[in-house]
Every structure is written in structure tokens, then in C-alpha cells.
Amino acid sequence: MRFQQFLFAFFIFIMSLLLISGQRPVNLTMRRKLRKHNCLQRRCMPLHSRVPFP
């Protein structure tokens, strides 16, 4: 019974760490590259500004 409680507390702790780390960007340059959509190519940015879809 005590082992199950420990396992449950450990599981909750790991899940909270994953949620917290998932909200922050790994580095700010990646965040700048990804601007409004998830495309990493440079030539894609002007194309996306001219077409009606993201």
C-alpha cells in the first residue's frame, strides 16, 4: 500500500515536470524561426504572407 502511494506521488511529480518543461521554448531562436506557423524554411515566410492560407 505504501509503495503504491509512493509510485502515485512519483508519477504525479514526473507529469508536472513534463507539463512545466513543455510550456517553455527550448531556445529563443527556435521560437523566432517558428513565428506564426511551424515551417522552418526561410523562403517559406514570404510565400505565407502572400497566400490566404497559413
From Swiss-Prot:
Question: Which GO CC terms are listed, alphabetically?
Answer: extracellular region; extracellular space
Q: Cross-referenced CDD domains, in alphabetical order?
A: Toddler
GO MF: apelin receptor binding; hormone activity
Q: Give the signal sequence positions.
A: 1-22
Q: Does the keyword Signal apply?
A: yes
- Gene Ontology process terms (BP): adult heart development; angiogenesis; apelin receptor signaling pathway; cell migration involved in mesendoderm migration; coronary vasculature development; embryonic heart tube development; endoderm development; G protein-coupled receptor signaling pathway
So which tissues is this one expressed in? Expressed in the intima of blood vessels. Expressed in endothelial cells in blood vessels in the heart and lung. Expressed in cytotrophoblasts and syncytiotrophoblasts of first-trimester placental tissue and term placentas (at protein level). Not detected in smooth muscle cells or cardiomyocytes (at protein level). Expressed in kidney. Expressed in blood vessels. Expressed in embryonic (ESCs) and induced (iPSCs) pluripotent stem cells. Most highly expressed in undifferentiated embryonic stem cell and is rapidly down-regulated during differentiation.
Q: Where in the cell is it found?
A: Secreted; Secreted, Extracellular space
Per UniProt, the keywords (alphabetical) are: Angiogenesis, Developmental protein, Differentiation, Gastrulation, Glycoprotein, Hormone, Secreted, Signal
This protein's record includes keyword Secreted: yes
Glycosites: N27
- Quaternary assembly: Interacts with APLNR.
Tell me which family the UniProt entry assigns to this protein.
Belongs to the Elabela/Toddler family.
* Its job: Peptide hormone that functions as endogenous ligand for the G-protein-coupled apelin receptor (APLNR/APJ), that plays a role in the regulation of normal cardiovascular function and fluid homeostasis. Functions as a balanced agonist activating both G(i) protein pathway and beta-arrestin pathway of APLNR. Downstream G proteins activation, apelin can inhibit cAMP production and activate key intracellular effectors such as ERKs. On the other hand, APLNR activation induces beta-arrestin recruitment to the membrane leading to desensitization and internalization of the receptor.
List the protein's name: Apelin receptor early endogenous ligand
Upper classification of the organism:
Eukaryota, Metazoa, Chordata, Craniata, Vertebrata
The record's gene field reads APELA
